[in-house]
Design a protein with these regions (language model features):
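Long, well-ordered, tryptophan-enriched scaffold segments
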Residues: 138, 142-152, 163, 169-195
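BRCT (BRCA1 C-terminal) domain core and associated BRCT-interaction motifs
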Residues: 34-43, 152-162, 187
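Structured catalytic/translocation cores of nucleotide/phosphate-coupled proteins
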Residues: 1, 128, 175-179
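Short secondary-structure transition/capping segments
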Residues: 49, 66-75, 148-155, 190-195
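A conserved hydrophobic secondary-structure block that centers on an alpha-helix together
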Residues: 75-160
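Noncatalytic luminal/extracellular "stalk/propeptide" segments of secretory-pathway proteins
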Residues: 1-113
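Hydrophobic alpha-helical scaffolding
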Residues: 2, 122, 180-184
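Extracytoplasmic/secreted proteins, especially bacterial periplasmic and envelope-associated proteins
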Residues: 3-18, 29, 128-135, 140, ...
Length: 195
């Protein structure tokens, strides 16, 4: 734990002793080990030949949905919307295995109708980032970059900012590797500079 947590535990232990509460553990103490894993991204950056992009300014990602990573890539593949559906696939005849892939959010529309649903209702490909992340994972993508048109709005929202900058703590026994390839959400400006 942190220094503050240790001090709080010491204080509680002393208060229990002063109050006459008998120790609960076989070792004569009041506390048991409770191993935790903390996910937190701090000062994350992405560098290109001419630019340095910063977490919470140019991009964001979900700490629990990504592994710690460091990549070097000669190029980034732009792959439309990153959809891999029987009705529409950006992955068809494209080798993206081991590559960094950049995609647009949303889905293709023709005359105000989704190519996938055939109506003005959007498909699951537009509603849940995990669907595109799963497609990227199954196609061997090394890292998925999604252009988020709402990035500035999200990063200027105090609740979102606190959530994205904060840490995620889980019991060590519940820890599991993220099920998707690493994925980040980037600004249009960052996308323009990367391509």
């Amino acid at each position: 734990g942190t220094r503050g947590l240790s001090r709080a535990a010491d204080y509680l232990s002393k208060q229990f002793t002063l109050s006459g509460v008998p120790p609960l553990q076989a070792n004569g103490g009041y506390f048991r080990d409770y191993p935790l894993v903390q996910y937190q991204w701090a000062n994350s950056t992405i560098a290109s030949d001419k630019n340095l992009f910063n977490m919470m300014t140019d991009f964001y990602g979900y700490a629990g949905a990504n592994n710690s990573f460091s990549y070097t890539a000669n190029d980034i593949v732009f792959l439309g919307y990153g959809i891999d559906d029987t009705l529409y696939s950006d992955y068809k005849n494209v080798d993206v295995k081991g590559k960094i892939v950049l995609i647009a959010s949303g889905e293709p529309m023709v005359n105000g109708k989704s190519v996938i649903t055939g109506s003005d209702s959007l498909s699951a490909w537009s509603k849940d980032w995990r669907k595109k992340a799963a497609a990227a994972t199954s196609n061997g993508v090394m890292c998925l970059l999604t252009i988020d048109p709402k990035l500035a709005e999200i990063l200027n929202n105090p609740q979102w900012k606190n959530f994205l900058e904060g840490s995620l703590i889980k019991r060590q026994s519940e820890y599991k590797q993220p099920e998707y390839t690493n994925n980040l959400f980037i600004s249009q400006n960052m996308a323009d500079k990367l391509l």
